[in-house]
Every structure is written in C-alpha cells, then in structure tokens.
C-alpha cells in the first residue's frame, strides 16, 4: 500500500510548526510522501533533514496545486481519504480503505473547500469533535496499519534504542 498525505491550506506565517508535525507523523506512521499546498522551504528542509538523519524514503514536495493533484491521483486509480470531523466514523470505513493499493490522505489547515468533500472517496472522522489534524492523521494511519508501522526500521544513521529510563540513541555513522 502506498500512502500520500496532502496538506491543504498551509499558511507559512501561521502553520509552519503544525505542517512540520503533520509531515513528521506521516513519515513515522507509515506514509510514503507529503505534498504541501503553498511554498515553505523551512518546512521542506526540516522534514528532509529528519529523513537524512533518521532514515526512510519519505519524500516532501511543496508548492502543489491541490485540485490538479487530487484529480490526477483519482484519474490514475488512487483513492482519496479526507480527514474531517464531519465524516463517517473511522471504524465504519477503515476495512474498506485497507483494501486500496494507493491512498491520498487529505489533511486541511484552514477551512477546507467543498470540492474536497465531493471528490473524496471517503470523508473520515476520527471522532466527531474538534481536535488536531496531527492527532487525526496519527490515529488514522495507526488504524490503517493496525500498529505495524510502529515496528518499522527506517535504516537511518540514528536509531532510538528503547530504554526504561534515559535516552539511548545509536549513531550508525552511515
């Protein structure tokens, strides 16, 4: 399964930290790439630096035209999941979604245009209450992969060695 996260409505002056966290969660929880509407070199550099140090093949692209990207993805056979508190409950649809080969997960920053609700194959709610898009993405990906993404070895230069106390980081010097 290939997962692309599309970050809609990124505003560089307001959303730098949250968009970075969306990217970090996407990478750590099993997505293959993030596409960011709008340009923000600092977010791109930050995420690429994490990939360089901690491993994986996660890619980051900013400045995308989201409507074109959604249409292109859908026309090529991919399925679109829009995370929104107004959608169907995650537990009702996650089984169907798991059967897809390519998924684009749409995560909004500001008010999401109605077109997104219409083009999405699934509008999915991780709870029907307001909360963070970072939390919604983490829960969605964890449910999608049934926790298996947490066992992945990213093959990076740095690797955390789980410890009951303190911080243990292995530097493999790659």
UniProtKB/Swiss-Prot annotation:
Gene3D superfamilies linked: 3.40.1280.10
EC number: 2.1.1.206
Keyword list, A-Z: Cytoplasm, Methyltransferase, S-adenosyl-L-methionine, Transferase, tRNA processing
UniProt-recorded Gene Ontology molecular function terms: tRNA (cytidine(56)-2'-O)-methyltransferase activity
A Pfam family assignment: Trm56
Disulphide bridges, residue numbers: none
Reactions this protein catalyses: cytidine(56) in tRNA + S-adenosyl-L-methionine = 2'-O-methylcytidine(56) in tRNA + S-adenosyl-L-homocysteine + H(+)
Subcellular location: Cytoplasm
GO biological process, one term: tRNA nucleoside ribose methylation
InterPro entries linked: Alpha/beta_knot_MTases (IPR029028), tRNA_m1G_MTases_N (IPR029026), tRNA_mtfrase_aTrm56 (IPR002845)
Record: residues binding S-adenosyl-L-methionine: 83, 108-112, 126-133
One GO location term (cellular component): cytoplasm
Top-rank lineage group of the source organism: Archaea
PANTHER family named among the record's database cross-references: TRNA (CYTIDINE(56)-2'-O)-METHYLTRANSFERASE
Similarity annotation: Belongs to the aTrm56 family.
Function: Specifically catalyzes the AdoMet-dependent 2'-O-ribose methylation of cytidine at position 56 in tRNAs.
Protein name according to UniProt: tRNA (cytidine(56)-2'-O)-methyltransferase
Organism, scientific name: Methanothrix thermoacetophila (strain DSM 6194 / JCM 14653 / NBRC 101360 / PT)
